[in-house]
């Protein structure tokens, strides 16, 4: 029984030692004390209980102290970690800003980091400006010639406007808009080719970095190419459209004329039918006149001679408009 008791006590002591070593990272505590970071044993145990990795917080605190950032406390680092921030990136950004002589405190750096910005990259861009290139921008001068331009924009991160400021895409879009506006206001495309710096000057005057997280230092036109003659194409397309409209109107007038012609032909046939109908009553009228004595025989033959003479004259003139003898049908 005594042996079993000794084994149980030894096991409990071993478990207690392992738990103590887990709860109290001696290596980190020793490193913090050696570097003057001033992290107590209770603080390390509290980090374990709050599920905060002590090594990340302690290493960041040691880096800050060694860089002279004594104001960055363990509580500030731990609070930033619990807010899902990147502690190491914030501390490295503070160190870089301090070495570069920039004014950047922990609260602002933490706010930039929590806003989703890369605070370390922002500090690096503030020290070393970066060049971003626009895609090929197409614009048309007043003479109708298309120009394709590529601009290189040198920007520097503005720490004060990183939170809530627009990003690179906004800067590129504004620069492209300025390039299009400048080329579009040029009377001659040759003037733009001869003086590409006019584009840079006009674009810089517009203050395109307002409301963005960057400060535009310079805009340089890297390349300008001549595209197609857009003005001529538009005129050609307009002429073709006018031609089609004119053809449509002419076709409409032709169809209207054909319809009117057919209508007149129908009316002519109708009048001829009425004429034939009227002429069919002439023999009956002549017979009735002869029977009643209102028309003499000599008068009838005189009328026949006139009709025959008229038909002969029309035949000689080439106009066969003569009608058959209406009296002969009776």
From Swiss-Prot:
GO terms for molecular function: nucleotide binding. The chain crosses the membrane at residues 3-23, 26-46. GO terms for cellular component: membrane raft; plasma membrane. It is a multi-pass membrane protein. InterPro entries: FloA (IPR022853), SerRS_1_N_sf (IPR042103), tRNA-bd_arm (IPR010978). It comes from the Bacteria. Keywords: Cell membrane, Membrane, Transmembrane, Transmembrane helix. Homooligomerizes. Belongs to the flotillin-like FloA family. Found in functional membrane microdomains (FMM) that may be equivalent to eukaryotic membrane rafts. FMMs are highly dynamic and increase in number as cells age. Flotillins are thought to be important factors in membrane fluidity. HAMAP family: FloA (MF_01562). This is Flotillin-like protein FloA.
